[in-house]
Amino acid sequence: MIIFQKKDVIPIIIPQICFNDKYDNINNYVEMNPSLFIDEKGNVRILVRCVNYKKLPDKHFTLYESKSNSIYYNITGIIHDSDKLDIETFDYTILDYEYNLPIFPSYWRGLEDIRFIDANNILVIIPELNEGGNPSILKAEINNNRITHFCHCKPNIVEKNWMPYFNNTNNYKVIYSLHPFIIKSIENDDLQEIELSETTKNKLVGYHGSTNGITINKYERLFLIHINRNITHHRWLLFNIKTNTITLSEEFVFFKNSYIEFTCSLVNYNNRIFVSIGVNDNKAFIIETCYTDIIELFPKCNNEENLPTIITMLYDIRSMENNTTERNRKLESYIDFSCKFLLKLPFPLIIFIDDNEETYDAIYNARKDANLLDNTYIYVCDFKSTYFYKHLSRLHELQQSFHILNGEIEHETPLYVILNNNKFDCIDRTIQLNPFNSSHFIWMDFGINHVAQSTDYIYEWIHKVPDKIKQLCINPYTETNSPKTHFQCIYHNMAGGLFSGSIENMKKYSELFKNKTEEIYNDNWYQIDEAVMTMVHRENPHLFELYYGDYRGIVSNYLYPVHNIDLIFKSSQKYLDYNKTKETHSLLCYCAKYFEMNPHCDFVFYYIQQNIITNYYNNNRLLLPNVINLINSKINSDIEHDKERIHILLENNRTNIEYYENKALILLPAAKM
């Protein structure tokens, strides 16, 4: 059995409530089933239920008065940001309540198992407010140390564990039951059954509700549910209120030796998740955990081919800026472009979007129409909560003092810079979540096919993503002046629209990018993401495996050149001009397949020439076999012009060729090399 990983366990020890029991002994109430709420400012309220009975492992219990009685302690205090939840400094008082409804005879007295709806509204079980004296759900208001204004919720039958959640339409609902899976509004009898798969239905048999639901993003709510066997087992339940789908975690327990575990509350405070839990009906705790540890218990999507996950995002920053200039493409055009390529790819895809229902629907429907929902994860994330958004005011300041000479300040706005930098925040979040259990990841701009051509080449390389960061180099950064001086202009050295790598290398790239960004901001300048990537590459070349071309070939050129061979040879010549033979050799090896398929291309002579220069230093004094084959094919060509050109090339490089140990493989009928 899985024991859930916990960041912290906070015991709740309350002042004892003593009484003379029915055996004429001094006895005391025992604490159990706490409820918890923390507001945005860190104000904490813990309600601890105390009872006059003790439950045993064999399900029997001992009652110490004639009837079961339940009393609540109200514990209040405050938590600051990342500080430990220290309830020893909190205030403890007995909770007061005032019924405004008739009281009926019941074996159970008092309030039971409170669940917070929000800071001032609760759901509570009160048998003595039910005509039959049975457990019954009521809604009530809580203010300070007092609960009032009780009202019945319908249908008022024994479904004890309703789970409230915010429905995103300015109202609250509850999960009323799990099997069948039914939701409803809080007070009205408007049950709505949601159809689930048979597999999911079977997993929910015997399960009951536990906690309220916390908001993970606009459409996803996280709950805890439980089942009582010989001991209590739990599952996390993730409910998508947009698609009416649920995902269940593996079963687990919180503690190794407990036999009863009852959770009433979940709280998400500053991305710290707290669970209130009663153990064995005689102990109360608060557990702190995090979403990363929770999501680890969810089964990963079936990815038998170990396909990489493609990561992308779509945020309408121009609407945030109220910017309607023609220079900036509208969101609709990005979606139109993506429907022709990215959104129809049959590979694992995670898309980060803002809290925008139209965007969500457009993406969801496009993937649904393509029957690709199983390979789709839509991650709703407020742009203001992303990692690089914290730099907004700093970028406004930097743009006043540091000017990119060929930049367009109306286009490269602070939000634009933040948006592109946030590729790495999306990468970090995806690796943390890893919904498709991938070992490798690909960043791909959402509207990449606006510039990319021959994009179907992705089907050739999607299974061949290397561990190293594979990224397009357009213009090698060989210049020797300081980065701050050099990057007063945008040079598009590296293309930021597509790059890939293993988990570890993508995490490392993200860390290096974040550090470099902080470094240049602290040096009072900034640049767009591609320039920062270029600097990271220059300082960490071992981390990268470059491919070459221009934006036109950003998808197609991944394995070998398809487009831009002319530009690629400008890059190789630039390397040579700076005496970077290793980089030139690597580029030429990347081009080998191109010339295998295009031996009559005019650039083949540049290819041969540069290999003659670089192979000696980078291939153990041996000309590459494919280079020798190309030389010999030109020597024996039926095209006189090719014969003349290769003869001139070899004559001009006679001295260099003499140093190669395999020069004898060159077929020269007219001269010995």
PLM feature spans:
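Beta-propeller domains
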Residues: 1-303
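N-proximal low-complexity "stem/linker" segments adjacent to membrane-targeting elements
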Residues: 303-333
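Short, aromatic/basic amphipathic alpha-helical patches
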Residues: 359-374, 392-394, 627
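Active-site-proximal specificity loops/subdomain of glycosyltransferases
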Residues: 371-433
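GT-A fold catalytic core of metal-dependent nucleotide-sugar glycosyltransferases
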Residues: 415, 419-472
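Catalytic core and acceptor-binding pocket of nucleotide-sugar-dependent glycosyltransferases
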Residues: 448-454, 464-467, 471-472, 476-477, ...
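Amphipathic alpha-helical repeat scaffolds of TPR domains
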Residues: 564-574, 589, 601-614, 625-629, ...
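Alpha-helical repeat scaffolds
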Residues: 585-591, 621-638, 642-647, 673
